[in-house]
Amino acid sequence: MGRVGVLLLNLGGPERLEDVRPFLFNLFSDPEIIRLPIKGLQKPLAWLISTLRASKSQENYRQIGGGSPLLKITEAQATALQQRLKEMGREVSVYIGMRYWNPFTEEAIERIKRDHIKKLVILPLYPQFSISTSGSSFRVLEEMWQQDPYLRLTEYTLIPSWYDHPTYLSAMADLIARELEQCPNPDQVHIFFSAHGVPQSYVEEAGDPYQRQIEECTRAIMRTLNRPNQYTLAYQSRVGPVEWLKPYTEDALKELGEQGIKHLLVVPISFVSEHIETLQEIDIEYREVAEEAGIEHFQRVPALNTHPMFIESLSQLVVKSLEEKPTTFEQITHPKANMKMYPQERWEWGMTTAAEVWNGRLAMIGFLAIIIELITGQGPLHFVGLL
């Protein structure tokens, strides 16, 4: 088989306040995050949004110590995984590839090539698949494989999602159970699953399986937990005026407060590491929302980080993938004839040349409107909070 490697994929995060703006630029330059009809507008718009959002985002990172802990945690996960695989008799080198910040996926691939890895397991640290997370990283990797003759000789296999893996579910249930045991009336605590949201159109138009996998994962965790607690699933981190998956976390918290819920245990279901969405958005912003809604006790389950059962689940996934038939990019990109993985492959802006021309004109008008709004400081985007 030759030398074996595991590539862990994740989002990445700014480690210093001065990294925030370029990180946001990389994020909003991704067509899986913001899709435009004219590719030439992608980076100018990313520059505008990152410039306008940098100050607020820096303040959020300042509240959690001045930077994201994501890389350090991912490095610890990689070390623990490599050690566990060694204990299982597998000599494997583990690499980290971040989508929007250092170390970038491209850097990881260069290290993999230098180490002469002959077989690579590509493992996203996203339990549930989405075109905006695992899908975006897969797109980058697929392009690299197509363009690099050396990589085309490297055997690889993908692990698209693992939200239903029994050991992962046990790790999540264990974290929840530990928090419940600290409560005076554990069976009366309302369990609140908060997942990162995606635009509704990803699910309805592009066929993204993310919502289905999140819902199935939530039910599976509750079955594994095997407790009588009531629970709610909601979606956080909405950006912009478009419809995202509902219910929104903020709205769901207010509704639970109106129902008289007093003790809430929040479970970050789509995050395996502590980062800005858990440490600032949940712990600070949503805590304030809950308290204002009348919820008196607000607890959060910690992220999995290097939980032994979580590392065990990753090692089991790697070993299983090495023993099975490889899963390729083509299998993920084209799961069925009428559905593509990437939204720019699936969504069409017009059926005729004339329609496409009008789409371009409308895009330019919209772009000019943004410029005018930036100059005046007033307009609909300021009203909805996007700018």
Swiss-Prot record:
According to its UniProt entry, the protein's GO biological process terms are:
heme biosynthetic process
Keyword Transmembrane annotated? no
Q: Which key words tag this protein in UniProt?
A: Cytoplasm, Heme biosynthesis, Iron, Lyase, Metal-binding, Porphyrin biosynthesis
Enzyme Commission number, as recorded: 4.98.1.1
| PROSITE patterns linked | FERROCHELATASE
Q: In which pathway does it act?
A: Porphyrin-containing compound metabolism; protoheme biosynthesis; protoheme from protoporphyrin-IX: step 1/1
Pfam families, alphabetically? Ferrochelatase (PF00762)
Per the record, the similarity remark reads: Belongs to the ferrochelatase family.
Q: Which PANTHER family match?
A: FERROCHELATASE (PTHR11108), FERROCHELATASE, MITOCHONDRIAL (PTHR11108:SF1)
Q: What is this protein called?
A: Ferrochelatase
Q: Which gene encodes it?
A: hemH
